[in-house]
UniProtKB/Swiss-Prot annotation:
Protein known as: Transcription factor xilB
Protein origin, superkingdom: Eukaryota
Record function comment: Transcription factor; part of the gene cluster that mediates the biosynthesis of the 6-methyl-2-pyrone derivative xylariolide D. May play a role in the regulation of the expression of the highly reducing polyketide synthase xilA and the cytochroe P450 monooxygenase xilC.
Keyword Disulfide bond recorded: no
One Gene Ontology cellular component annotation held by this UniProt entry: nucleus
InterPro entries (alphabetical): Sec_Metabolite_Reg (IPR050613), Transcription_factor_dom_fun (IPR007219)
């Protein structure tokens, strides 16, 4: 029977290697990752749905009890023992009490703490911390016992690894999965590092539920437990564990930075951008307290030539880069002051090129293939470019200066993009081998064209008397820049439409899709209200950063209409989408009505309530049919079809030190 599914008793990797559970000498232990995938140092290849366990399923949580304390789950983890003494937990750091009181960075080479280290004074005891120790560990054990059962956590972690991590690249998947299995293997939790990792797991799971249901998982529950219940439980556990960790260890580590970022990303998915900004600020402060922004931490003083240590240090650099991208992008969009300075990121750029394992292709092609982190590096350089200009938005808009910056952007940034991310003719050779590469490409395009919009947006705020006072050549320049602004907004919406299609064209809480559906729509509506806007005539088109863009009133309003449709569809999931849809619809009505009364039927659109279906071919159609989503759970969530598709792989690579001296990261040698 076509579509018949059967239960699989091993992970997909073991199944293909015929290491079935029936073979007594080579048993797949069915954990995530399993013993064989861990031994092969390929934990990211471990893909399967765990079988049902005979435990009573939790009934859906009533709406009036959604905020109540969740019940403990017997199969979450074994009971942990309370640590016997302080030395077991390894929480004491040299002069931690002094650093906590004065706020010193403990790994500094120039502050007073550096002098005290040279004097070799005895450790300072923290009375407040000692008094809080027993009760804090009681809280930790209580929260750990409330974690959802492992099968649920395994599913969410697997979904995150294969479907979500490509977006922000906060963690390095192979090393995370290796630590994930080690964490589950522990008999008891007695170290703060393990509690921090538990907070990371909980917050990753809470974040992952924001993207469910999805085309690969169409139901709103996992193993009989509602997604809302799982989300609230994991969020509460993550928050309480994070608070406990900060109480026990003021300094923190990389893992703390990571789980704070995931907490911020979760509120971003909920449409609370102001809290997202505050969360990024908290992560930036945590990163500096932990010292991951420097190369003078304990890791660097150890065996510098050891590849494992160097990889671990590079993971820190990558997380810091991801944080810088979020900080730069948000500060530019929201007109805020960034938390991280440029010199910090220039000193901590990744030094390893991790070659992806993409199957049977020539070695030469593989070495030119983009790393999974290449898109983030493009985003880092984008932030460095715009922030390096030191622009002051308080100054009056100068068309000449904006034109100079635009030309510089073309020559210094766009001309140095990796071929797979080129604007005009990207190299799509490896799109099938790297399934997330097309999505990363659209994500970068959104950021690039949004930054061009940011460069020219102030021209819309010029008053008539300011425009009248401009020199004639500046008026001509201003007219062409209006056109560029409109074309850039169109390109943002085109990239958003393509990315949304790759997500299945369905409901999503991904803030990049929501935010960047709203902003360019507002820009286009504003531009279309200008009587002197230089629209293209007939079949003419204009070049923008090497690509031809046709800019007419009809095309612009059609793109806006589609953006509003998208916002209306996502309004049920996001307050940001709902409020954006309301404002955009009102502006749309205001823009369309004068045109309808003064011209033949250019657009016949409904602007009250729903806008109705689009009457013109959509930009989405040029991208073809919706991609097939690799199924993690469909029908029977713990069975697997015979023709299980191969998943995207970010395998344990062989680290290679870049021969380039930083901050230069461009060129064939790096990629």
């Amino acid at each position: 029977m076509q579509g018949q599914k059967r239960r699989v008793r091993t992970c997909h990797s073991c199944y293909t290697r015929k290491q079935k559970a029936s073979e007594s000498d080579s048993i797949c232990d069915r954990q995530y990752p399993c013993n064989h995938c861990t031994r092969r140092r390929r934990p990211e290849e471990c893909v399967y749905g765990p079988p049902p366990v005979k435990v009573p399923s939790c009934p859906p949580v009533p709406a009036d009890q959604s905020e109540t304390q969740p019940r403990p789950v017997e199969s979450a983890r074994p009971t942990r023992e309370t640590p016997v003494d302080d030395s077991e937990a390894h929480w004491s750091r040299e002069h931690s009490a002094l650093a906590r009181s004065f706020g010193y960075f403990e790994d500094s080479n120039s502050n007073t703490m550096a002098l005290l280290r040279r004097l070799e004074l005895p450790d300072q005891s923290d009375t407040e911390l000692k008094n809080a120790w027993p009760s804090t560990w009681e809280t930790i054990h209580h929260e750990l016992d409330l974690m959802p059962e492992r099968q649920i956590i395994d599913f969410l972690v697997q979904y995150f690894v294969y479907e979500l991590n490509w977006m922000k690249q906060v963690i390095h998947v192979p090393s995370f999965l290796a630590n994930y299995q080690l964490w589950w293997a522990k008999d008891k939790i007695v170290e703060i590092a393990d509690v921090e990792f538990a907070a990371l797991i909980a917050r990753i799971c809470s974040y992952a539920t924001q993207f469910l249901p999805s085309p690969s998982h169409t139901v709103d529950q996992i193993r009989g437990r509602s997604l809302a219940d799982i989300r609230d439980t994991c969020s509460n556990i993550g928050n309480k564990l994070a608070t406990a960790c900060e109480t026990l260890d003021w300094k923190g580590t990389l893992v703390r930075v990571q789980h704070i970022i995931f907490a911020a990303l979760k509120v971003s998915c909920e449409g609370r951008t102001s809290q997202f900004w505050e969360g990024i600020g908290s992560a930036c402060r945590a990163a500096q307290k932990a010292g991951i922004h420097t190369d003078t931490t304990g890791l660097e003083s150890q065996l510098a030539k050891d590849s494992a240590q160097e990889l671990e240090r590079d993971v820190q650099r990558r997380t810091f880069c991801s944080l810088y991208v979020l900080d730069s992008h948000l500060s530019r969009q929201l007109d805020r002051i960034p938390f991280l300075s440029n010199h910090l990121i220039e000193e901590t750029l990744p030094r390893l090129r991790l070659i992806p394992d993409i199957g049977n292709i020539p070695t030469e092609t593989a070495t030119r293939a983009p790393d999974i982190f290449t898109e983030r590096l493009m985003q880092v350089q984008l932030g460095l470019f715009w922030r390096g200009l030191g622009l002051q938005r308080t100054c009056e808009f100068d068309p000449t200066e904006s034109e100079r910056i635009y030309e510089k952007f073309n020559s210094e940034y766009l001309n140095n993009l990796h071929p797979a991310f080129a604007i005009a003719h990207p190299d799509t050779t490896l799109d099938k081998a790297l399934p997330k590469l097309p999505m990363q490409r659209q994500l970068l395009y959104i950021a690039i064209f949004d930054s061009i919009c940011w460069n020219f947006r102030p021209l819309l705020l010029l008053k008539p008397d300011q425009v009248a006072s401009l020199a004639p050549y500046k008026k001509v320049l201003l007219r062409s820049q209006k056109r560029r602004l409109g074309m850039a907004a169109l390109k943002v919406l085109e990239a958003v439409a393509a990315l949304h299609t790759m997500f299945g064209g369905s409901y999503t809480r991904f803030s990049a899709i929501i935010f960047n559906s709203f902003e360019p729509a507002i820009l286009l509506l504003n531009l279309c209200s200008h009587a002197d806007f230089p629209f293209d005539q007939d079949d003419n088109s204009t070049s923008l950063v090497g690509t031809k863009v046709r800019m007419t009133y009809r095309i612009a309003m059609q793109a806006v209409e589609q953006a509003i449709h998208r916002l209306q569809m996502l309004a049920d999931l996001s307050d940001m989408a709902a409020s954006g849809a309301r404002v955009a619809t009102l502006l749309f009505a205001r823009s369309v009505q004068p045109k309808q009364s003064s011209s033949p039927p250019a657009l016949t659109l409904s602007v009250s309530g729903s806008l109705g279906p689009s009457q013109f071919p959509t930009p989405i159609e040029r991208y073809g049919e919706q991609e097939n989503w690799p199924s993690l759970e469909a029908g029977d969530p713990y069975s697997m079809p015979d023709n299980f598709p191969s998943m995207a792989q970010d395998s344990f690579p062989s680290p290679q030190l870049s021969s380039l001296k930083f901050p230069v990261v461009w060129g064939e040698a790096f990629f």
